[in-house]
């Protein structure tokens, strides 16, 4: 009986040993998953790209996640030059310059890299200038550099209604604003050959380009391009085209509202020479003028209010000589500006200035410190308000 007990004990210990060894082997073969929190815990993400530090060529990218409570997380990379930011669900992308690998942030633990699909374009030198979330997937505006001189070549890559990733025909315009409405992608861009700004749309069902000629005999620069309460809204500043010297052109800014289906439009001239910022708020259009007024219009172009901004922190964004203003982002009731020091510095990358989108009063100033003691001057910066 004692012998049987010993045999049973040995058998049990052997089984336990085999289980432990097996678990050890399984654990060794299984790669560790990086632990980390969701990047959407932060309120903002900013990218900073510098070609020189301390006066020497040393390209570097910095991606900084920041919250209104001053919590920050920084990533630096000297191999991949990336900057244009885009949010897709719970991930953040930093698109590369000139065909390098782009950066993908899925958690606070780090980032991975990815490349555009090979063989899609004639050239491997390309830059994603603009990205937006479409109905069927990501929409990307891509600039192609094939060595052509004096010619702009852009393309739009999107997912068609039949769920195929599609690349548009070549567009000889530098696209800088776009919006998807139904199965059309409307966009504005600059035609260098014609020296004019244009509004066009891409039909996703046929992959055909269509030019909207409302501005063919005018000379305007589209400061902003919005989709508000079912209408396309273009905010226009005067532009002196070299081909329109003998044509009398308006000297003030204007606002146009257009039906996206019929392309019927109406415009109103504004009592200001230039609009410096514009955004949608509660189905209205907000316009910030160069002479420090905040104008609010309906999509039917009726003036709702006119507020003076002179002397406010928001107005000072455009006149501050210590910092360079790089733009404003709007999302819901938040407006955020990004500024960087005008000269090389060893203390900070820049500041995120958080405003109330309704009143444009300053809520928070978030300083992003420079993490190493080196002379830094920003050559490119982008800011994204993270959507929760």
Region roles according to the model:
Residues 38-58, 79-97, 102-103, 120-143, ...:
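Short beta-strand elements that form the blades of beta-propeller/WD-repeat-like
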Residues 160-323:
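Acidic, serine/threonine- and glycine-rich low-complexity intrinsically disordered segments
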Residues 21-29, 33-36, 40, 94, ...:
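Hydrophilic extracytoplasmic domains
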Residues 69-70, 99-101, 109, 146-148, ...:
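Short coil turn/linker residues within repeat-based beta-strand modules
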Residues 66, 95, 105-107, 142-144, ...:
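Hydrophobic/aromatic beta-strand positions that recur at structurally equivalent sites within the blades
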Residues 2-135, 157, 375-379, 387-388:
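N-terminal "mature head" segments of proteins
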Residues 136, 196, 250-252, 347-351:
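A detector of repeated loop/turn-to-beta-strand junctions in beta-rich toroidal repeat architectures
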Residues 33-34, 72-90, 111-131, 165-182, ...:
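Repeated scaffold domains used in trafficking and secretory/extracellular systems
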């Amino acid at each position: 009986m004692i012998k049987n007990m010993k045999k049973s004990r040995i058998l049990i210990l052997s089984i336990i040993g085999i289980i432990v060894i097996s678990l050890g082997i399984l654990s060794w073969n299984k790669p560790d998953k990086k632990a980390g929190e969701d990047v959407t815990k932060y309120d903002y993400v900013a990218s900073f790209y510098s070609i020189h530090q301390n006066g020497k060529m040393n390209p570097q990218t910095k991606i900084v996640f920041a919250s209104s409570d001053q919590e920050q997380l920084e990533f630096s990379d000297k191999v991949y030059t990336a900057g244009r930011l885009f949010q897709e669900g719970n991930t953040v992308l930093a698109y590369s310059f000139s065909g390098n690998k782009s950066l993908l942030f899925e958690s606070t633990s780090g980032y991975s890299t990815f490349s555009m699909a090979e063989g899609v374009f004639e050239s491997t030198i390309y830059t994603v200038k603009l990205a937006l979330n479409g109905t069927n997937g990501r929409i990307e505006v891509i600039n192609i550099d094939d060595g052509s001189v004096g010619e702009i070549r852009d393309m739009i890559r999107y997912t068609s209604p039949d769920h195929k990733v599609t690349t548009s025909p070549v567009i000889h315009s530098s696209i800088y604003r776009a919006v998807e409405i139904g199965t059309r992608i409307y966009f504005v861009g600059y035609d260098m050959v014609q020296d004019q700004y244009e509004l066009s749309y891409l039909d996703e069902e046929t992959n055909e380009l269509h030019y909207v000629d409302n501005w063919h005999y005018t000379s305007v620069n589209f400061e902003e391009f919005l989709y508000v309460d079912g209408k396309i809204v273009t905010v226009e500043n005067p532009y002196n085209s070299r081909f329109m010297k003998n044509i009398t052109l308006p000297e003030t800014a204007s606002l146009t509202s257009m039906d996206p289906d019929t392309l019927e439009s109406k415009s109103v001239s504004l009592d200001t020479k230039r609009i410096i910022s514009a955004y949608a708020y509660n189905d209205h259009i907000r316009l910030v003028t160069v002479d420090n007024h905040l104008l609010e219009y309906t999509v039917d172009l009726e003036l709702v209010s006119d507020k003076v901004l002179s002397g406010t922190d928001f107005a000072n964004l455009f006149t501050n000589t210590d910092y360079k203003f790089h733009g404003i982002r709007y999302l819901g009731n938040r407006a955020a500006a990004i500024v960087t020091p005008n000269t090389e510095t060893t203390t900070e990358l820049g500041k995120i200035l958080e405003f109330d989108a309704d009143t444009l009063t300053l809520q928070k100033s978030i300083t992003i410190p420079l993490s190493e003691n080196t002379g830094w001057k920003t050559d490119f910066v982008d800011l994204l308000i993270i959507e929760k």
